[in-house]
Amino acid sequence: MTTLTARPEAITFDPQQSALIVVDMQNAYATPGGYLDLAGFDVSTTRPVIANIQTAVTAARAAGMLIIWFQNGWDEQYVEAGGPGSPNFHKSNALKTMRKQPQLQGKLLAKGSWDYQLVDELVPQPGDIVLPKPRYSGFFNTPLDSILRSRGIRHLVFTSIATNVCVESTLRDGFFLEYFGVVLEDATHQAGPEFVQKAALFNIETFFGWVSDVETFCDALSPTSFARIA
C-alpha cells in the first residue's frame, strides 16, 4: 500500500489496483490553433502541464498502475454531439465556435482530425487504455466504470485539461459511483481565468476528493526515483 500526502488529508491506496487518468490531452485543449485557443481561451501555459503529466505517467506505469487516456469529441457529422434537443448543442464552446465560424466546421473535436489527436508528447503505450468520450464526464456513455470494476480498481488519480470541466466532471461522477479521486494539481490546467482552477480544486478537496502534486505522487510511489523520472 502507498500513502500519498494530499489535501485535506493523506490517502492510502494500492497502486496495482488504481488508475491514472489522463483527460483529453488533445491538440484541441493544449496546443495553439486548437479548439480552446480558437474559442478565446488561454493555452499559453500548458507546456509545463504536459511535462508534468509525462512524469506522472512514467511513475504510475512503473508502479503498475493502469493508465487510461480519454479523447473528447464526436463523429465528423457531429451526430454524437447532439442536436438542438441536447443541452450539449447549446453549451459546448466547440460547437458554438463552429457556428460562429463556419469555416471551422468538421475541424474541431472531430474524430480523425488534428484537433482530436493527443499532443505529440503524450503517447499511449501497450497495456494502456484509450477511450473516446462524447461529453465532459468520462463515465457518460463509455465503458470506464466496467473497465475499472472488472479490475478491482477503486482509486483514480486525475491529470489534464480542463480542471474545471472534464476533470472535475469525471471525478464528481466517480465520487457518486464510490470511487476515490485524487487530482495532481500541477498536472492540470483550467479552461478560463486562474480563479476557476482554484475554485475547482477547492470543490474537489472540500467535497469530492483529494488534491496532491506530481512530485509528491512520484515520491510516494518510489521515494528514490523522482529525480531520475523528472
UniProtKB/Swiss-Prot annotation:
S-S bonds: none
Entry's induction text: Up-regulated by the nitrogen regulatory protein C (NtrC also called GlnG) and repressed by RutR.
EC number: 3.5.1.110
Active site as annotated: D24, K133, C166
Catalytic reaction(s) noted: (Z)-3-ureidoacrylate + H2O + H(+) = (Z)-3-aminoacrylate + NH4(+) + CO2; (Z)-3-ureidoacrylate + H2O = (Z)-3-aminoacrylate + carbamate + H(+); (Z)-2-methylureidoacrylate + H2O + H(+) = (Z)-2-methylaminoacrylate + NH4(+) + CO2
MF term (GO), any: hydrolase activity, acting on carbon-nitrogen (but not peptide) bonds, in linear amides
InterPro entries to which the protein is assigned, alphabetical: Isochorismatase-like_dom (IPR000868), Isochorismatase-like_hydrls (IPR050272), Isochorismatase-like_sf (IPR036380), RutB (IPR019916)
Top-level EC class as recorded in UniProt: hydrolase
Pfam family, one: Isochorismatase
Keywords: Hydrolase
Keyword Ubl conjugation: no
Superkingdom field: Bacteria
Any single biological process term in GO: nitrogen utilization
Biological function: Hydrolyzes ureidoacrylate to form aminoacrylate and carbamate. The carbamate hydrolyzes spontaneously, thereby releasing one of the nitrogen atoms of the pyrimidine ring as ammonia and one of its carbon atoms as CO2.
Family in the record: Belongs to the isochorismatase family. RutB subfamily.
Protein's recorded name: Ureidoacrylate amidohydrolase RutB
Upper taxonomic lineage: Bacteria, Pseudomonadati, Pseudomonadota, Gammaproteobacteria, Enterobacterales
Gene (UniProt): rutB
